[in-house]
Amino acid sequence: MTKRANIGGAAALLGLALAAAAPAGAQQPSDGKTVFDKWCAPCHGDGPGRPGTAALQALYKGAKPALLEKRTDLPPELTKQFVRTGVSVMPFFRKTEISDAELDALAKYLAPK
């Protein structure tokens, strides 16, 4: 066997070993909080400069929480619809941005407990 074949075989074995050693959750979809923090919080998070939160605060005038994470009336189907189709000035998000699995996790995270 040549030196080149030995190196190629060793590299293949190393790749298999690394794949087998990957954490169990490595291929699992993100949890809903992680998805929210990445895609939603820039507009719908707490604090100044959050246009989504400001718009909901103006709309609800205290009748409902402006912070999505504090709402108790967001069924998963509604969250999924808003994310995929957008609403008012909120853009829609493609499956290449938020996968179906991530959207499921997000909708579950924001759903009434």
What residue ranges belong to the model's regions?
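Electrostatic cytochrome c docking/interface patches
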Residues: A19-V35, R50
